Amino acid sequence: MSNRSAVFGGAGFIGTNLVYQLIEDGQQVFNFDNLSGLGNLLNIAELMQQSRHSFARCDISNPEEIRQALLMAAADTIFFCITPKNPEEESSLDNFRTFFETVKEWRNGMTDTKLHKIVVVVSEHYKLLGSYGRMYTDLLKLLDGYVADGLPISSLLVPPAFGPFQQPDSPISMIIYHAIEGETIPVVNPEEKVSDLVYVKDVVDAIVLVEKNGKIGGHYHLSGPSCGLTNLEAADVICESLNEELPPPVGRYQALIEEVATSPVTSDIAKDEANLVVLGLQGKTSLEDALRKTVNWYLNNPRWYNQSRTRFFYLWQNPETVLKIA
């Protein structure tokens, strides 16, 4: 692995977890985020005094800010952890073009650049499942074009993830927030099997694997672990963990569950993990273990949780918008 890494989108959910892992691996990390959307300085607050971590704001629609970030980092590896917020819009990839065009110009103008790999991480979000297909196809064409121009790009597509540092914008985090707050716990399509859901630590492992072993121009897919749990059973695992670690004043957290029927939410991208397995992908964390670890993380980080609960009040108080409840 490289010694100097630049992470764009490094204050978001997946980016934050990646930054922590890179620092743990001994990397010098240059972290760039525009702090729009769910990007959150609180995610990286404890890293601000670390000598191996530097943070600066960067808007990937601004070529000058991108150039300044590239000059500052002088990175061996770039991790791009930003996914379009509106994948169905024609303009969804405009910022991607700006970013990679700027990187190409910068690299062509440097005689001593050490940049050897750019890993583009495309993460599906539960709320937008079923709307990524066309954007993803167009993105791969865009990336292939820049590979042909000489940029050392590999990509990784990941399904909806959950785990530490996640705001209440997915079914798992929504359940945890509502349970801790003693609110009704919405469980969508309770009898459906959990499918294509992955622990964020496994996502980070896959990103690092692609950086280390992935081919230039390679496009890789990560799938969730095989799981026999229904959505209701997954909620029960979360509630049981909370019953043990944070017993409610009365009864059990399961009493808060409200079953909600809605249209099935599925991805419109067919994933094939075979190429990632060839790189050396290891077994993933089981859903049950990952859910318990996630609950424990929230309970062990009350300062982060309390600030997130306040800042993102509009999310966890409006589950129908997050969970696509009709």
Question: Language-model segments: which ranges?
Answer:
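Conserved SDR Rossmann-fold cofactor-binding beta-strand/turn motif
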Residues: 157-162, 176
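Generic structural signal for small/hydrophobic residues in well-ordered secondary structure
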Residues: 14, 33-35, 44, 175, ...
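Short, surface-exposed alpha-helical segments at coil->helix boundaries
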Residues: 41-42, 137-140, 173, 232, ...
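N-terminal Rossmann-like NAD(P)+-binding domain of SDR-like oxidoreductases, especially those catalyzing
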Residues: 1-159, 301, 318, 326
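Hydrophobic alpha-helical packing elements
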Residues: 14, 65, 135, 171, ...
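Conserved sequence/active-site signature of Rossmann-fold short-chain dehydrogenase/reductase
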Residues: 61, 126-127, 161-163, 198, ...
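The catalytic Tyr-centered alpha-helix of NAD(P)H-dependent dehydrogenases
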Residues: 128-136, 164, 168-172, 196-200
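C-terminal substrate-binding subdomain of Rossmann-fold SDR/epimerase-dehydratase oxidoreductases
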Residues: 24, 179-183, 187-326
